[in-house]
């Protein structure tokens, strides 16, 4: 089960991808929306990470580099394989630790296993 806040963030990421006419819902869409979450912002602040730079990098990436996944017609974005893996990994972690529901920080941590994603690149930059 996922938290209500995470559901909202996933929906916003979906809407972002849909508004951009992207065929796929990517980790970059998700991370951009996660950057607006209060818990994630607190975590970044605690770690000395400037969320503004992550948002700027992600926005530029989505605008310029995701043109290859723009559909010719309106489509419902499909979650990418990496998006699905992150959700599954976070859910498995929460289930194995008996912590209840998947929250935004669980997703953020699970993203780090996707070493080849630009989302992780921007987080580590």
Give the positions of each predicted feature:
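Histone-fold recognition with a strong bias for associated Lys/Arg-rich disordered tails
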Residues: 1-125
């Amino acid at each position: 089960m996922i938290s209500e806040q995470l559901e909202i963030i996933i929906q916003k990421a979906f809407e972002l991808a849909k508004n951009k006419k992207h065929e796929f819902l990517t980790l970059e869409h998700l991370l951009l929306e996660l950057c607006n979450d209060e818990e994630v912002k607190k975590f970044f602040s605690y770690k000395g990470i400037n969320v503004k730079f992550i948002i700027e990098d992600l926005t530029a990436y989505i605008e310029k580099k995701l043109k290859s996944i723009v559909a010719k017609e309106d489509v419902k974005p499909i979650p990418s394989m990496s998006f699905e893996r992150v959700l599954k990994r976070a859910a498995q972690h929460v289930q194995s630790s008996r912590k209840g529901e998947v929250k935004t920080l669980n997703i953020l941590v699970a993203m780090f296993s996707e070493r080849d994603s630009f989302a992780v690149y921007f987080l580590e930059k």
